[in-house]
Each structure stands twice: as structure tokens, then as C-alpha cells.
Amino acid sequence: MLFAPFISYMTDITPTSPEEGEVILLNKPLTWTSFDAVNKIKKSCQIKKIGHAGTLDPLATGLLILCTGKKTKEIDSYQGAEKEYTGKMVLGKTTPSIDLETAFDAEYPTDHITHEALMKAVQQLTGTIEQFPPIYSAVKIGGERLYKKARRGEAVEIKPRTVTVSLFEIDDSHFPEIYFRIVCSKGTYIRSLVRDVGILVESGAYMSELCRTRIGKFWLKDAEEIEGYVARKRAELGLSS
């Protein structure tokens, strides 16, 4: 396999009082929003103060960090941490959202695309780069989320952002499906990288799978399933099942 196995660092997360709070590592399920996860934990475990440290799109899975109580003060530090993702893009088609949230809107040829062309595209997208966020994103323009404007069909001017992609590996052995592993800075949109790969190889691309495997020192391998966390926490708190 192209990708090296993930290393799991032991964390120092231990049970604490509700006031002190805790850092919760969850594996976000497919189709759930980050706020779905927050609300599930908040209501099921009767937690007053809780927030998440970085949004995951509904069609993405993987590591989601929640902080409760006084630990919510640490959210900013986790949001700013380096992120790692694995996923799959498919060449030859595009969607407005660059993933499967929206229907295909165009098809492109792929016969001309070589391994060398793909590697060159990846190299161009590695390092400190200027990136345009997707129109279907939570970026705010004029006080409103871009995805709301997109769903109304409203045209907006999107400004590029400076982000850092420190690692961009691909496996094109199942072409036109391309598996990838990316390590990047805060604010990087993986869908934008996928879109730009398609453009650079003179075709189109969309993302069919995405999983966040790491946030800073925290790894998906150490995360709990949401229902498992809820059951364990309710038992700790003496709440009825």
C-alpha cells in the first residue's frame, strides 16, 4: 500500500468533573453534521457547556473533537492544529459541491491523463498555496454562509485563502479513482484540492470519500463511536439507560 500505517499517540484524557470538563474524541458518522454530534452528546449526557473544535462536512467521516466545561477554552488551539485526511477522488465528472451532496453537472475526458500529469498536479498543490474555498462551504460572505447563497443560485465573489499542504500523496492504481492522503493547515478545503487536481490535468474531479484521521496529536484510532460514548458517559453519571 502507498500509505504508511497511522501511529496512535496515547492521550492524557481522563474523566473529570462536569465543571472541569473533558476533551472528547469521536468518530463522526456519515451524514451527521458536527452540530448533530454536539447536540446528541449535550442532550443525552445532560452537558451544559459543549462545543466542537472543527467542522466536518456531513459526507465526511472521522475524528471530531468535542470539548466540555472549562475544556472549551482549548477549542481554539485544536482548531488551529494540523489536520490529516484520507479519501478518494474520481476524475472525469464534476458536481457543484465537489462531492456527492449535489448531482453531476458535467463530464470530461480522462484518457489523456498520465501518472506523470497527476504527480505534477499534486506537486503544484503542495506547500503554501492560494486556495479558493468551495461555493458549498461554511465560509461567510456578507454575514451569510456561502452554501446558503449557493443553494439560492446566487453568484458571489470568493477570495482566495493562503493555506499550507505539507503532504499530498496519491495512489492512482484504480484510475480514474484516486486515493489520497493529505496533511494540511487550518482552513484547507480538501474538496478545493480535489477540484484543482481536476483542473490541472485538464479534466474534472469530485470527492467521493473523506475521512479525517488526525487533529494535532489526536488520532482517529483513539476515538469512540458516538453511541458508545453516550452509553459509557450516562453510566458514569448514573443516568437511566
Question: What residue spans do the PLM features occupy?
Answer:
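Catalytic/RNA-binding core of pseudouridine synthases
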Residues: L2-S241
